[in-house]
């Protein structure tokens, strides 16, 4: 039986629960080519300065929107061209989420990490298709799922022959329009063998909380991120934007990009202490 690797390499970035903190970051959705390059360039500069391994993320299609009229992204074909050019320009690996089995084969030649959205984390055919590409697979734990139930989710990937899987905690449903973060989930998921990522921005979402769109409490991103890093994780997932209040999706929980350097500097200090103990 194939088991999950405790250390997963994505290009030049290492994810391990005992290694220095790595970062998955970028805007929620890919808006335009120019915007992607602006965000990527700023993230590359700050992470190089701080010595943090960066995987750049963005979504080509936000398939799970609150409203039918909500913006969804620039689409698969255009996004793959941009991802390819970003990799050539900046040399970092990239991540995007996929929603159907057919998308796996199209995305895998360009994208380094295929991400399974939380609401799709139990979709067996999707997990198998992602695993069979040979790419690293990052699975978001469903808001409805206990952390120990991720054992079966990860097994669908590893038993399809792919040990390179990441497990991401992004909060659990707590009544209506609210998520909470149970920090016990982090060591429980780490005990399953895979590197654990904490999604600090989706964890402060208020799903559907604005009626026609999702709300959020970005003022608590740092609080939860500090707690997760103090517990000990392989990496953080943080969505960021230069103007979150006018972003096409997930603005209320994204971190303004000009706040990112100071935030990352604090979190790296917590990480060094946590992993030295």
UniProtKB/Swiss-Prot annotation:
<dbReference type="GO" id="GO:0005737">
    <property type="term" value="C:cytoplasm"/>
</dbReference>
<dbReference type="InterPro" id="IPR013785">
    <property type="entry name" value="Aldolase_TIM"/>
</dbReference>
<keyword id="KW-0808">Transferase</keyword>
<dbReference type="GO" id="GO:0008676">
    <property type="term" value="F:3-deoxy-8-phosphooctulonate synthase activity"/>
</dbReference>
<keyword id="KW-0448">Lipopolysaccharide biosynthesis</keyword>
<comment type="pathway">
    <text>Bacterial outer membrane biogenesis; lipopolysaccharide biosynthesis.</text>
</comment>
<dbReference type="Pfam" id="PF00793">
    <property type="entry name" value="DAHP_synth_1"/>
</dbReference>
<comment type="pathway">
    <text>Carbohydrate biosynthesis; 3-deoxy-D-manno-octulosonate biosynthesis; 3-deoxy-D-manno-octulosonate from D-ribulose 5-phosphate: step 2/3.</text>
</comment>
<dbReference type="GO" id="GO:0019294">
    <property type="term" value="P:keto-3-deoxy-D-manno-octulosonic acid biosynthetic process"/>
</dbReference>
<dbReference type="InterPro" id="IPR006218">
    <property type="entry name" value="DAHP1/KDSA"/>
</dbReference>
<dbReference type="InterPro" id="IPR006269">
    <property type="entry name" value="KDO8P_synthase"/>
</dbReference>
<keyword id="KW-0963">Cytoplasm</keyword>
<comment type="similarity">
    <text>Belongs to the KdsA family.</text>
</comment>
<protein>
    <recommendedName>
        <fullName>2-dehydro-3-deoxyphosphooctonate aldolase</fullName>
        <ecNumber>2.5.1.55</ecNumber>
    </recommendedName>
</protein>
């Amino acid at each position: 039986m194939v088991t999950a690797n405790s250390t997963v390499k994505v290009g030049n970035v290492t994810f391990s629960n005992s290694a220095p903190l790595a970062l998955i970051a970028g805007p929620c959705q890919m808006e335009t080519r120019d915007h992607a390059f602006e965000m990527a360039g700023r993230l590359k500069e700050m992470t190089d300065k701080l010595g943090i391994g960066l995987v750049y993320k963005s979504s080509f299609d936000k398939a799970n929107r609150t409203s039918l009229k909500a913006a969804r992204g620039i689409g698969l074909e255009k996004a793959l061209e941009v991802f390819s050019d970003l990799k050539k320009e900046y040399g970092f690996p990239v991540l995007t989420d996929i929603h159907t089995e057919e998308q796996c084969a199209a995305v895998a030649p360009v994208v380094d990490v295929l991400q399974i959205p939380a609401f799709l984390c139990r979709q067996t055919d999707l997990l198998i298709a992602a695993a069979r590409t040979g790419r690293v697979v990052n699975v978001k734990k469903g808001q409805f799922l206990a952390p120990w139930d991720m054992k079966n989710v990860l097994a669908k990937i590893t038993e399809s022959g792919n040990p390179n899987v990441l497990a991401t905690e992004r909060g659990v449903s707590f009544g209506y329009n609210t998520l909470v973060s149970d920090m016990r989930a982090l060591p429980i998921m780490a005990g399953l063998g895979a590197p654990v990522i904490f999604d600090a921005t989706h964890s402060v979402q208020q799903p559907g909380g604005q009626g026609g769109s999702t709300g959020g409490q970005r003022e608590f991103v740092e609080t939860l991120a500090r707690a997760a890093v103090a517990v000990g994780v392989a990496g953080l997932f943080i969505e960021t934007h230069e103007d979150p209040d006018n972003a096409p999706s997930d603005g209320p929980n994204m971190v303004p990009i000009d706040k990112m350097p100071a935030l990352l500097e604090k979190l790296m200090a917590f990480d060094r202490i946590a992993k030295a103990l």
